[in-house]
């Protein structure tokens, strides 16, 4: 049976954090409490290597969903309530613009979302003059069924990878050699297959078509559960590919701190922004456990071998 012990975390090169008072912090991470637009405005320009954003999907407006096989109201919090399509888009465009200000010339931005918000984000990026680098589909094999039986089950999310458009050749960081090595010596495509350990290949021709990752495992929620928590494995691939070693990763909607957990394990530094005290406390517990090497052994990346073929 393979060992569940986690390999030692990579040592970080010495690099200062932006000089801002943090709600909580460790040697390689900091959490800032408050509105993301206000906190982003306080950060120095060109100080961040990578932004991963999982913004509100604006779904908490009295609707219903399926939770553990039962009908349940969609009520994640006031932060997820829509204020109307125009105001929602104005907010989306505002935080994207704020992220662009703090990105280094080699920096880039990832946005995760469903159809409820991702097209607004894409239009905002285009209207701000960003370069759309890739879109990726994240397939959830354990997605909840739909209740109305009037449309297909929502079993995927879209991720946009983009960078501010700058004069000259592309400058954004991309670890092409590492991604190619992980893909068996072939160029990695913008649609990946990352099956669960033990799964068989998903395609008859061996070509990976989408990122196949389950929702966060129970071990990843050992210290608490966030309603929109992302799996650590998803963030591992993103950060490993697009943030330099020792670089600063920013999450303006940090929630339970998953981005920070993945960043620390990969030898990157992390700065998170969150306005909800409950999720700040959860993120702090996870990051402190990670810094101390006491995080749950199961809250890991899983096997390093990737079944991506395309």
What spans do the regions from the language model cover?
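SAM-dependent methyltransferase catalytic-core segment centered on the flexible catalytic loop
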Residues: 47-108, 266
């Amino acid at each position: 049976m393979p060992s569940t012990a986690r390999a030692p975390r990579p040592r970080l090169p010495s690099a200062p954090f932006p000089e801002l008072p943090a709600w909580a912090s460790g040697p390689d991470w900091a959490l800032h409490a408050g509105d993301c637009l206000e906190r982003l405005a306080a950060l120095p320009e060109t100080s961040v290597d990578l932004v991963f954003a999982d913004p509100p999907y604006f779904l908490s407006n009295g609707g219903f969903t399926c939770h553990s096989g039962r009908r349940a109201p969609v009520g994640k919090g006031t932060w997820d309530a829509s204020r109307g399509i125009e105001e929602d888009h104005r907010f989306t465009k505002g935080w994207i613009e704020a992220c662009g200000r703090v990105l280094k010339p080699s920096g880039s931005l990832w946005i995760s979302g469903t159809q409820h918000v991702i097209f607004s984000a894409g239009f905002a990026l285009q209207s701000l003059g960003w370069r759309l680098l890739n879109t990726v589909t994240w397939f959830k094999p354990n997605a909840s069924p739909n209740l109305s039986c009037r449309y297909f089950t929502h079993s995927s999310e879209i991720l946009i990878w983009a960078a501010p458009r700058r004069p000259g050749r592309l400058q954004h960081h991309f670890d092409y050699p590492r991604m190619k090595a992980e893909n068996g010596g072939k160029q990695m495509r913008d649609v990946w297959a990352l099956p669960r350990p033990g799964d068989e290949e998903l395609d008859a021709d061996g070509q990976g078509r989408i990122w196949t990752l389950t929702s966060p495992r129970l071990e990843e929620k050992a210290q608490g559960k966030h309603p929109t928590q992302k799996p650590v494995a998803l963030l591992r691939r993103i950060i490993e590919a697009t943030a330099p070693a020792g670089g600063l990763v920013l999450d303006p909607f940090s929630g339970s701190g998953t981005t920070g957990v993945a960043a620390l394990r990969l030898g990157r530094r992390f700065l998170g922004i969150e306005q909800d005290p409950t999720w700040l406390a959860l993120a702090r517990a996870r990051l402190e456990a990670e810094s101390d090497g006491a995080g749950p052994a199961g809250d890991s990346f899983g096997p390093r071998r990737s079944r991506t073929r395309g």
